[in-house]
């Protein structure tokens, strides 16, 4: 043990020494990294204690507010909002209690409480993640994984200003329309209203007002219905829409009898249209809510309720994994050009006919493309970390595009002799030409992108070996996919008769441009700032997604060849460890070996 008397001489002796004490903390941590490591480890604990004191009310307070009965009633109310009647009744019987009825409350209180808790927890979680041994990429990956899971559980949905307002109590000012004059039946007119007149088009509105317009007692806007059902998930969940339709159906007492009947019929028609055209929106939870709603409708409208029930039955069949309806073609399927060595383990690009490669590339990509659902194309889901789980097929298409582009560049760069490289380049140009003939603009653009990688584009002597005919073909293909005039030539070709596989990148760019424009219109209602949904934007989104839907329904009359598809699906097996940028850099280094800078033709093999 060191006593004060023994310590003083040491301090005195140390003080007389000339020691540089500037940056002492930095120097100590540098020479003793274990101290720094310890500080990093305990930092989140210290911070968590402070946050815990702020956000944790203590066991006694929690117990007073959340006893066993309160928790059971929260669960019962949650089951009620989700339409799970049988489960709710069983729990009521077992717990010997009833579900609390709260007027005007359609949101699950349990979910609301969990969301609020998560908001507070996020502060501790993010702070803790910031001070761990995870790399930046690992940390982001874990945060993304957590957020995607919570989004799938509907626990991180944005709050909706309409949540606490019953549709029948919504202020009349919360909708802004515009008169549009039309002289003939067009997309803004229903068949009921095709006389020369002014149409009222919704520009901005609250969710309640949008649903009210959707189910108006006297006006039937067919185009509005189509646009709404395709785009509603950009501002509302399916469960919320179902809840709002139920609110709208339950007209207040004293409401005009004829208007009430018309509104209720409109609600039923919306339900049927929703089920018939957007069955993929319905998970088990939403189906349970719909069945409960149908039971209510059955009392007053047995025939319409039966029609919705039939649609629901068909929908369940469509959602079944065993359902795989086949398209019947009028023309005979062309015979595939199968190489003699089709079963060889060493099958190469030179063994397969260029046209057959184009066919199989088209079948592979169209299978992904046809599965893209409208919600995947909303709110830039493919671009945003929190929403990527909602756009699996769009992300597959993007990944496939990158795979084909890198495959093209890799096959050319890996070919060591200049004449052989030119032969490989020629082969890809021929494949691209066949893709053009198949109206497969996505794979066509992927090959053009690969040929335009800087590592390939710089191969001057390789290009000089291409024939004049090949160069003309390549020039024509580039003109089709030229970005000039916002891809004017390509957009003109979209008028061709399907089957067709559009270049998805153009349409994702269009959707991004629309999404990044001002989202909502903020207006002053009764001295209160209210944010209204920009429905004009949804109309533009509808037009783009409609084009995609039109080309999804007409498949290619081609015969799949399993072995060739396996070959084309494995083209990127050795690239998985690289990002696109890393791989392009690696290819560029290889390209410099093939044709060094300032090299003469005689220097290149």
Curated annotation (Swiss-Prot):
Q: Which intervals hold domain Ras-GEF?
A: 353-597
Main location as per UniProt: membrane
Q: GO biological process: what's one of them?
A: positive regulation of gene expression
Q: Which CDD domains match?
A: RasGEF, REM
Q: Which part of the chain is the N-terminal Ras-GEF domain?
A: 198-320
Looking up InterPro entries in the UniProt record yields: LisH, Ras-like_GEF, Ras-like_Gua-exchang_fac_N, Ras_GEF_dom_sf, RASGEF_cat_dom, RASGEF_cat_dom_sf
Q: What happens when the gene is disrupted?
A: Grows at a normal rate, but are severely impaired in both chemotaxis and activation of adenylyl cyclase, both of which are critical for the early stages of development. Unable to aggregate.
Residue ranges constituting the LisH domain according to the UniProt record: 67-99
Which compartments is it annotated to reside in? Cell membrane
- Kindly give the PROSITE patterns that the UniProt entry links to this protein: LISH, RASGEF_CAT, RASGEF_NTER
What GO MF annotations does this protein's record show? adenylate cyclase activator activity; guanyl-nucleotide exchange factor activity; guanylate cyclase activator activity; protein kinase activator activity; protein kinase inhibitor activity
Q: Which UniProt keywords apply?
A: Cell membrane, Guanine-nucleotide releasing factor, Membrane
Is Cell cycle among the key words of this record?
Answer: no
GO CC terms? cytosol; plasma membrane; Ras guanyl-nucleotide exchange factor complex
Biological function: Ras-bound GDP/GTP exchange factor required for normal activation of adenylyl cyclase. Component of the Sca1 complex, a regulator of cell motility, chemotaxis and signal relay. The Sca1 complex is recruited to the plasma membrane in a chemoattractant- and F-actin-dependent manner and is enriched at the leading edge of chemotaxing cells where it regulates F-actin dynamics and signal relay by controlling the activation of rasC and the downstream target of rapamycin complex 2 (TORC2)-Akt/protein kinase B (PKB) pathway.
- Subunit structure, per the record? Component of the Sca1 complex composed of at least gefA, gefH, scaA, phr, and the protein phosphatase 2A subunits pppA and pho2B. Interacts directly with gefH.
Protein name from the UniProt record: Ras guanine nucleotide exchange factor A
């Amino acid at each position: 043990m060191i006593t004060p008397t023994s310590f003083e001489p040491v301090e005195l002796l140390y003080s007389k020494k000339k020691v540089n004490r500037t940056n002492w903390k930095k120097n100590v941590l540098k020479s003793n990294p274990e101290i720094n490591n310890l500080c990093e480890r305990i930092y989140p604990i210290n911070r968590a204690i402070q946050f815990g004191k702020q956000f944790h009310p203590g066991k006694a307070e929690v117990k007073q507010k959340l006893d066993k009965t309160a928790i059971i009633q929260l669960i019962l109310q949650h089951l009620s909002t989700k339409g799970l009647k049988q489960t709710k009744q069983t729990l009521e019987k077992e717990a010997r209690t009833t579900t609390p009825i709260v007027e005007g409350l359609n949101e699950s209180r349990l979910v609301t409480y969990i969301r609020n808790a998560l908001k507070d927890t996020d502060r501790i979680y993010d702070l803790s993640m910031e001070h761990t041994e995870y790399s930046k990429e690992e940390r982001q990956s874990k945060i993304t994984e957590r957020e995607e899971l919570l989004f799938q559980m509907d626990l991180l949905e944005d709050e909706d200003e309409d949540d606490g307002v019953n549709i029948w109590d919504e202020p009349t000012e919360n909708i802004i329309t515009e008169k549009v004059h039309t002289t003939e039946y067009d997309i803004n007119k229903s068949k009921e209203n095709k006389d020369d007149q002014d149409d009222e088009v919704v520009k901005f509105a609250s969710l309640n007002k949008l649903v009210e317009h959707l189910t108006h007692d006297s006006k039937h806007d067919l185009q509005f219905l189509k646009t709404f059902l395709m785009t509603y998930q950009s501002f509302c969940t399916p469960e919320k829409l179902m809840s709002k339709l139920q609110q709208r159906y339950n007209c207040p007492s004293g409401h005009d009898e004829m208007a009430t009947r018309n509104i209720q019929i409109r609600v039923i028609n919306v339900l049927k249209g929703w089920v018939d055209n957007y069955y993929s929106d319905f998970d088990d939870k939403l189906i349970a809510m719909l069945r409960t709603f149908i039971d209510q409708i059955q009392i007053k409208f047995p025939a319409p309720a039966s029609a919705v029930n039939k649609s629901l039955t068909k929908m369940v069949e469509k959602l079944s994994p065993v359902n795989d309806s086949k398209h019947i073609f009028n023309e005979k399927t062309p015979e595939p050009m199968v190489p003699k060595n089709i079963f060889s383990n060493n099958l190469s690009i030179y063994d397969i006919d260029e046209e057959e490669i184009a066919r199989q590339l088209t079948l592979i990509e169209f299978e992904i493309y046809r599965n893209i659902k409208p919600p995947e194309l909303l709110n830039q889901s493919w671009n945003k970390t929190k929403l990527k789980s909602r756009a699996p097929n769009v992300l597959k298409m993007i990944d496939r595009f990158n795979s084909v582009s890198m495959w093209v560049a890799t096959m050319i760069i890996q070919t060591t002799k200049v004449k052989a490289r030119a032969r490989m380049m020629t082969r890809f140009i021929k494949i691209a030409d066949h893709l053009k003939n198949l109206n497969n603009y996505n794979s066509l653009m992927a090959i053009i992108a690969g040929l335009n990688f800087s590592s390939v584009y710089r191969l001057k002597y390789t290009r000089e070996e291409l024939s004049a005919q090949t160069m003309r073909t390549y020039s024509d293909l580039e003109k089709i996919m030229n970005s000039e005039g916002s891809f004017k030539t390509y957009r003109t070709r979209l008028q061709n008769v399907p089957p067709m596989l559009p270049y998805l990148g153009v349409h994702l760019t269009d959707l991004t441009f629309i999404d990044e424009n001002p989202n909502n219109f903020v207006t002053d209602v009764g001295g209160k700032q209210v944010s209204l949904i920009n429905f004009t934007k949804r109309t533009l989104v509808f037009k783009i997604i409609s084009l995609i839907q039109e080309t999804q329904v007409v498949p290619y009359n081609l015969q799949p060849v399993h072995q060739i598809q396996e070959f084309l699906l494995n083209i990127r097996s050795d690239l998985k460890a690289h990002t696109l940028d890393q791989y392009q850099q690696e290819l560029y280094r290889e390209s410099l070996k093939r044709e060094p800078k300032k090299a003469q033709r005689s220097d290149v093999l």
